[in-house]
Amino acid sequence: MLHIIENLLDTAQLSQLTSILTHQHAQWQDGKLTAGISAQQQKNNWQLSRQDPSYQAMANLCLEALQQHPVFMSAALPKVIMPPLFSAYQLGQGYGMHVDNALQTHPDSKQLMRTDLSLTLFLNNPADYEGGELVISDEYGEHSIKLSAGDAVLYPSTSLHRVNTVTSGQRLAMVTWVQSLVRSDEQRQILHDLDVSHILLRQKLLATSDQAQSTQAQSTQAQCGQLSEQHSTDQQLTHQAIEKLNQSYHNLLRLWAES
């Protein structure tokens, strides 16, 4: 399942990142250095070295944004997030069809991590370049993705995908990988659906409460008592439904999560 994560970074954060990436002293290296053996022949881009003096602050900014974004946290259920890579695709560069390595070595801990999910964050707008679409292939066909700056796409690392050749301008992006607490994409999707339903029901409960208070304020004393009693009953039923849904979510998480 693909998840579009909107407004992961704001305008100020994007400006901070792109000013570093377009600075003449940025330490770029051949993207092939971080590609798996089978993908090296397909990969043609530049990547900011993790040894660049600005890299750690940039990485921290992006990782903190991910950990604070409710859609990412709900959909990914992250256990480990790989320190990101910042990439640039210039005229004539692209990345042929490939699948990400199932296991990657974390550059800090030196421990192997399983890649369950891949994430691409777009750092400049579609109008800044032509080509450069991220094309993800799954059982439903191919999905061509070219998002606004600050938006990201999260997708299963099992998917074949490519970056189309850039025909003008420059494409800037951040990529990272996630080892989830829940290995199965299907199970993660069920949990995410339950989480979203739980949130929507709570929002409905709050909205109904506000509406009831407004109605009571405009009613007679007798009507107010009847409305208050009915509203209290409805709220209790909705609250019970929410808690049963919450119970199901956490019990499934206990069943499926790998600590």
Swiss-Prot record:
2-oxoglutarate binds at R171. NCBIfam families: PRK05467.1-3, PRK05467.1-4. Fe cation binds at H98, D100, H161. This is PKHD-type hydroxylase PsycPRwf_1523. The keyword Repeat does not apply. GO terms for biological process: DNA damage response; intracellular iron ion homeostasis. PANTHER family: PKHD-TYPE HYDROXYLASE YBIX. It comes from Psychrobacter sp. (strain PRwf-1). GO terms for molecular function: 2-oxoglutarate-dependent dioxygenase activity; iron ion binding; L-ascorbic acid binding. Its cofactor is Fe(2+); L-ascorbate.
